[in-house]
Amino acid sequence: MSPDLKKLKELRERTNSGLLDCKNALEATDNDIEKAIKWLQENGIIKAAKKSARIAAEGITKAYIKDNVAVLFELNAETDFVARNQLFIDLANKIQDALAANDFSDIEAANKVKIDGMTIEESCQDLTAKIGEKITLRRAEKFVAKPGEVVAGYTHANSRVADIAIAKGANQEALRHVTMHIAALNPSHLFESCLPKAQHDEIVNRINSDPKLANKPEKIQESMKAGMLKKEFNELGVLMFQPFVMEDSKTVAKYLEENQLTLLDATRYEVGEGIEKKVVDFAAEVAEQMKQ
């Protein structure tokens, strides 16, 4: 049976699928729109599976705050162009709402959270089939503030860097300023205690035996040691010792103290970090596309 032109147009508009795919779907389902959509979904999963070996290293990362919940996630695509596609943005917005409303312990559990009757993983596969690029939820983090705690987050304008934080206290605006600092300076560690013990011990021992301390009164020695440790930990990128980006006359630790905040945890994502991007032979890629 030849496809009905009106139904062909409707199917394309509802699914954003290609003309030939829609034609085949209608022919296979006797021009039944709903069955044709299901046919496209079933065949779309196959197409998505063929794309599973591709590397998705572009995309967005978002921080989302709702009441006492902070969610951070990275949604990947293969190209920056697709990451600006409205369908991709719509999916990201649905994911943020779903992750905020549901518990998850790791990325596998996050991908099983449901939106619109499908898991996040299935929704990514569905969008992969529609736009032709591999879409994946790569990672996600969630902080839930207890009474006496506060959460905050920051997403940079290009959505390539975002972070969330949780602290004891109530000043959310001040904590948000700290998340802006974290996004900008990308500290290597949050606290001195986060440094590997061997590295920390080496620094302390080296400073304690510094010749400049010789013959100095004890109080002056302690002051000099504190200054040298502060300088060393700042150079190593420890957040608490970094000059606060909005007021560099004080450290982040001092800024938090002034605002009655005690930082508990923070997480920062940058799109594609840790992913090895594949260098593609364009001629080979074209040849491969011609086989499909």
Swiss-Prot record:
Domain of life: Bacteria
Chief site of localization: cytoplasm
One cellular-component annotation, GO: cytoplasm
Gene Ontology MF terms in the entry: translation elongation factor activity
Record family assignment: Belongs to the EF-Ts family.
Region Involved in Mg(2+) ion dislocation from EF-Tu: start-end pairs: 79-82
The keyword Cytoplasm is annotated on this UniProt entry: yes
Protein name, as recorded: Elongation factor Ts
Subcellular location: Cytoplasm
Organism: Metamycoplasma arthritidis (strain 158L3-1)
Keyword terms of this UniProt record: Cytoplasm, Elongation factor, Protein biosynthesis
Known role: Associates with the EF-Tu.GDP complex and induces the exchange of GDP to GTP. It remains bound to the aminoacyl-tRNA.EF-Tu.GTP complex up to the GTP hydrolysis stage on the ribosome.
Gene: tsf
Keyword Protein biosynthesis among UniProt keywords: yes
